């Protein structure tokens, strides 16, 4: 990985918003804050930027039917996506061109669950709305927590058909515990070769144990000269975990040396971590 040129992303929105709010939103996760306490989203962005982030990510990870339906908010999807885009864009504008906005394109069902990945036609229907409504607000698209080759195809094909001309960053989630395979068990090289047909600008890993990410980056370096990066979890994800069930994840503390091996951190990481 080329450490002479680094881009610092932001970190977790969902956990940080929940911590500040002291409320327990489960079903719709961070999307609830677009309806209530939306000022907190801007505050979190500002703190990440003050700590060195050069990119902020739209709060659209859970503005999709699978999450919104848990609270009967499916009809609010378009409005919530637009509001998320506006908040991110308005925050970036305050910094006079120094901050880029990444449009978050998430899995369409639970994260970390390749067994729940939709087929292409089902995915196109939802991604089309998300991409179309985000496009006026973002500088590039960040496909996050992608867990299989099929999900890779689903999201990249959707972006190709929309044809916005904006860069695409593709971020896979790997199996935890020092693995270099996607959560589907498929290899990084196989996923990369499929993705290259769509020519994304950058490849990343996210929502994964740091040890697996370190191993994955070594392999990714051998495959491409494009931008590569990572934003790991500080916990490991057990099999069968979902946002709503009671299966507990295992939190890990990391040293500063382990931190700087990655471009950014994600879930359960706070703005203050960046000021090391």
Short names for language-model regions:
Residues 2-35, 61-68, 97-120, 172-179, ...:
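N-terminal small/glycine-rich loop or linker at the start of catalytic domains
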Residues 142-153, 204-219, 275:
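Active-site glycine- and acidic-residue-rich loops that bind
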Residues 267-276:
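Single conserved hydrophobic/aromatic residue that forms the stacking wall/gate
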């Amino acid at each position: 990985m080329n450490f002479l040129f680094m881009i610092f992303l932001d970190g977790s929105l969902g956990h940080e918003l929940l911590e500040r709010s002291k409320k327990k939103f489960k079903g719709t996760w961070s999307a609830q804050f677009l309806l209530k306490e939306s000022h907190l989203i801007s505050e979190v962005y500002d703190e990440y930027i003050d700590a060195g982030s050069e990119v902020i990510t739209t709060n659209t990870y859970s503005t999709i039917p699978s999450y919104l339906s848990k609270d009967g908010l499916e009809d609010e999807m378009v409005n919530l996506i637009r509001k998320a885009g506006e908040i991110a864009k308005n925050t970036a504008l305050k910094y006079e061109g120094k901050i880029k906005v990444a449009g978050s394109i998430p899995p369409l069902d639970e994260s970390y669950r390749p067994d729940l990945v939709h087929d292409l036609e089902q995915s196109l229907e939802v991604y089309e709305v998300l991409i179309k409504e985000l496009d006026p607000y973002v500088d590039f698209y960040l496909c996050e927590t992608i867990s299989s080759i099929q999900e890779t195809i689903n999201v990249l094909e959707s972006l190709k058909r929309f044809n916005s001309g904006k860069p695409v960053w593709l971020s896979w989630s790997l199996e935890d515990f020092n693995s270099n395979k996607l959560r589907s068990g498929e290899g990084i090289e196989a996923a990369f070769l499929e993705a290259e047909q769509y020519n994304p600008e950058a490849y990343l890993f996210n929502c994964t144990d740091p040890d697996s990410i370190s191993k994955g980056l070594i392999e990714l370096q051998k495959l491409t000269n494009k931008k590569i990066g990572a934003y790991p979890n500080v916990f490991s994800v057990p099999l069968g975990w979902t946002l709503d069930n009671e299966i507990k994840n295992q939190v890990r503390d990391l040293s500063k040396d382990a931190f700087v091996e990655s471009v950014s951190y994600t879930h359960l990481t706070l703005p203050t971590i960046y000021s090391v």
